[in-house]
Structure formats: structure tokens, C-alpha cells
Amino acid sequence: MTMLLDGGPQFPTLGVGGFGTARHHEMSNRDAGMGLNPFTEPSHAAAFKLSPASHDLSSSQSSAFTPQASGYASSLGHHAGQVPSYGGAAFNSTRDFLFRNRNSGIADSSSAGSQHGLFANHGPPGIGEPPGHLIFPGLHEQSSSHTSSNGHVVNGQMHLGLRGDIFGRPDPYRAVPSPRTDHYAAAQFHNYNHMNMSMNVAAHHGQGAFFRYMRQPIKQELSCKWLEESTMNHPQKTCDRTFSSMHELVTHMTMEHVGGPEQNNHICYWEECPRGGKSFKAKYKLVNHIRVHTGEKPFPCPFPGCGKIFARSENLKIHKRTHTGEKPFKCEFEGCDRRFANSSDRKKHMHVHTSDKPYICKVCDKSYTHPSSLRKHMKVHESQGSDSSPAASSGYESATPPAMVSANSEEPSKNSSATHQTNNNSHNTGLLPPNFNEWYV
């Protein structure tokens, strides 16, 4: 239900009227409440009783809605008897009521600064309330200096000292021209642009959960560590020029150090380069190598959601096969139909057919046909200090079968290992079932 109230000449769209002395003779026998719409239901009248009856007010106590204590200020002080009721206002429709322009008189700054009421204007002198306000814009920001004897703060809320449980928050939730004291005081976005997202929030106020993700991007400084040529007067030193973006660093490296087509010496002079001054046969190979030092990766994966980037176009081409499912490299061994996305994986697979085991463990000299098997085996050595189980490596591919290991072992260790294995089997019967088919029951 939309409640249509009359605000008088000061606040024509607030709809709170009937507080002038001209209507006191009409309210002698009933409560002086809000000037409700005559078309509203009578049952809603009790919900808007904001002040005590007029005959209950003593000479020293004033209602929150009398002109002497309200935010109407001096304009109502001089024209208190001219505040009309709802019947005096001509509203053709609800649209006229909601969109009426509030261009009528504004309270004087001297009176508005000293009087604080329910509908006081909070702006600085000479500035009116912005259009599009709520019907009840909120209470005045109550501080320790503004708290009156008729109001007190309970649990962060201000009690108005009226008849009825009417509470209002001390901070109005509206756009005000005056500085605010809440956590979003800098929400005016006066420093907003695409590079500066800081809200200039005061140090004593914490930022909201949303603004912590709007931090200013960290400025990047990339330094060139190319060793310049030494002369008789100047020893060899690094370039040490700094750049704010990768594009600027790459452009500098291409123009200043790598050189153009006339450059025949394709040597990397980056500081502490492991090549040690060894030259490349072609310029493009030097360019690809320099990306190892600069960290440039100019080839992103075009498939949405992947997000991987690569330093070489060849690596991107191989990676895209994981999305397309293309496997152009077929196993050359007769009778094998395995296919692979790159030639290196095919080469690793060929060791299965040739029985070659080029991947050797440096700890125990065991060899394997695939590097993944060697990596699994290395985990056994890493866990030997904490895991004393003799069957820790039983699930890994090994060059020597377990039976041969026990046959080649020394005689004194046979009895001890057999006894130890028997004890472990009797002790771990509850952990490892004798038949692995029981896992699938």
C-alpha cells in the first residue's frame, strides 16, 4: 500500500503535514499524529503514531513534530499556521505525488544548523537535498554533541524518546552532499579511472569486503641484464635499464642488443647465462633463447578456459593437440597401433619394444624403460627413512624381478628376511588382504 501524505510548502513530497497550530482545534480530543491520507484504512493509523497527544505536552516539553523542534527551521517558524493538510494539496494522480519537484523554500542555514528533527536537512548551507530522495530520508547523523535529552543510543541505534518503539539509524543511507562518517565515505568515486581504483578511505576506517578486490595494480619493473661491451676506459657492466612492461623490454632487447639482419654474431650476453658465450646458428634461435631470461611468453592457447601460454610456437602447436585430440605420430613397431601427439612421447614408447632401459636410478643402478617408472622408483628412496616396509616398491616396474633379488642376496640375510616377512604378514593381515580380488566384492 502506498501511503500518500502531505508535506506542505517545505517538503511537498514527504507527506507529513498537519502539524501547524491552525489545526490544533481539530486535535483537541485525539492524538496529534501524522497527517494520514483520508483514503487509508483506519487500522493503519496506530502504526504511525509518532508523538504524544497535544494535551499531554507540557510547556517545557515539545513534540518532535512541532515547528519549534522540527527540521522545518525558520520557514515554519514564521508560517506555522499556514501548513496545509492533505485536503489542501491538489494531486491529480500518484505520479504527480511521487514526481513533484521540490523547488519550494529551503530552511535558513542558521536555523537548520541549530535545530535537528526527524526530517532535517543535513547538507551544508545553501545546498538542498538532491532529487529522488526516499520519502523518509533518515535521521540526522547523531554524534555525542548532537544527542539531546529526549534521545539516547541503544545498540548502535538512536531511540527518539517518543511514544512507541520508533528507532532510526544514526547514519542515513542516502547520497548526501556533506562528508559522511561511515566506511564508504569515498564512494563519490572522484578519483575513479581505469588505472586507479583506490577509494581513498581514511586510515581509521576499514575497507569493505568488496573494495579489497579493487586494489591498485602493482607496478612492474623489469630490468635488462645484458652485458655491454667493455672498453679501455669502461669495464664490462650490465645495461640495468628498467621498464614497466614486457613489451618495452622486448623492444629494447631487439633494437639495442640483438640487432638487425646485419648482425652476424648470435651470442647471448645476458648476465650469468649458462651457455657461456656459445653462439647460435640463427637469429631466431637466439630470440627464443632470450625468452628464457626475460620470461616472455607471447603464444597463448586460443581455446577458451585453458589460459596456458608458451614461449615458443612449437610448444603451442603441440599443446593444442591435447584439445583437438590429434595424434599424428604412430608407433613404427610392427603390430603396435599406439599413436602420440608428439614425437618425444613416441620415442619414449619405442623403448618398450626394443627392451632398452636408458633411465637409470643413480642410487641403486636400476634401469627403466620410461621416465615415469623412474620417478615412481625414486619415491621409494625418498621414503626409506620413514617407511621400513620391504614391499614398498613392489608395485613399481623394476629391471630386476623380486625373485632374482632374493636369489642373489646373501645366505645370512635369507633367514632373517624370511622371518621378518613372516612376522609382517602375521601382523598386517588386517591391513593387506591376501587376495586382491576381495577389493571388488
Swiss-Prot record:
Gene3D superfamilies: Classic Zinc Finger (3.30.160.60)
Biased composition (Polar residues): 406-429
Biased composition (Low complexity): 383-399
Zinc finger (C2H2-type): 222-257, 266-293, 299-323, 329-353, 359-381
Major localisation: nucleus
Cell location: Nucleus; Cytoplasm
Swiss-Prot/TrEMBL keywords: Activator, Cytoplasm, Developmental protein, Differentiation, DNA-binding, Metal-binding, Neurogenesis, Nucleus, Repeat, Transcription, Transcription regulation, Zinc, Zinc-finger
Entry's Gene Ontology BP terms: central nervous system development; determination of left/right symmetry; embryonic axis specification; neural crest cell fate commitment; positive regulation of DNA-templated transcription; positive regulation of transcription by RNA polymerase II; regulation of transcription by RNA polymerase II
Protein's job: Probably acts as a transcriptional activator. May bind to the minimal GLI-consensus sequence 5'-GGGTGGTC-3'. Can determine the ectodermal cell fate and promote the earliest step of neural and neural crest development. Involved in establishing left-right asymmetry in the embryo.
Domain notes: The C2H2-type 3, 4 and 5 zinc finger domains are necessary for transcription activation. The zinc fingers and the N-terminus are independently important for establishing the L/R axis.
Protein name: Zinc finger protein ZIC 3
